[in-house]
Amino acid sequence: MQVILKEKVENLGVLGDIVNVKPGYARNFLIPFGKAVQATQANIKAFEAQKAELEKAEKARFEAAVAVADAIKDKVYTIAAQAGEGGKLFGSVGTAEVAEAVSNQSGKKVEKSQVRMPEGVIRSVGEFEFTVHVYTDVDADIKVNVVAAEA
């Protein structure tokens, strides 16, 4: 199925590209989430008329994402968690806790789905590095310091 992309989609294309995708991917993901429209002659003409304003909106989203990334990157965020002897945590610190700490301490909204934890959840105290995937092609590297909470 051919679709016209209305925004940049990772591993697929950029705004305005006409790409071939499997019908299920188009019907269940791209079209319902407003990332693409079916590539009919009428939609191609309508897209050409809207292309300038879509590019402007895409640029605004990208610039906002860069501003968020610049505000949160290269900083150390502290999370207090219950820990036992030897620095082992009772439970773990996951993406939700990291996103909440970054949002609270930086003042910028970060969703838990944007936090990338390649090593998995944190189960001990210490300093850890993560990547926050703010937007397509916009990442921010952060450090999280997990400390034992005062009883």
From Swiss-Prot:
It comes from Francisella tularensis subsp. novicida (strain U112). Binds to the 23S rRNA. PROSITE patterns: RIBOSOMAL_L9 (PS00651). One of its GO terms (cellular component) is ribonucleoprotein complex. It comes from the Bacteria. Gene3D superfamilies: Ribosomal protein L9, C-terminal domain, Ribosomal protein L9, N-terminal domain. HAMAP family: Ribosomal_bL9 (MF_00503). This is Large ribosomal subunit protein bL9. It holds the Pfam family Ribosomal_L9_C. InterPro entries: Ribosomal_bL9, Ribosomal_bL9/RNase_H1_N, Ribosomal_bL9_bac/chp, Ribosomal_bL9_C, Ribosomal_bL9_C_sf, Ribosomal_bL9_N, Ribosomal_bL9_N_sf. Transmembrane segments: none annotated. The keyword rRNA-binding applies. GO terms for biological process: translation. Belongs to the bacterial ribosomal protein bL9 family. Keywords: Ribonucleoprotein, Ribosomal protein, RNA-binding, rRNA-binding. GO terms for molecular function: rRNA binding; structural constituent of ribosome. The keyword Transcription regulation does not apply.
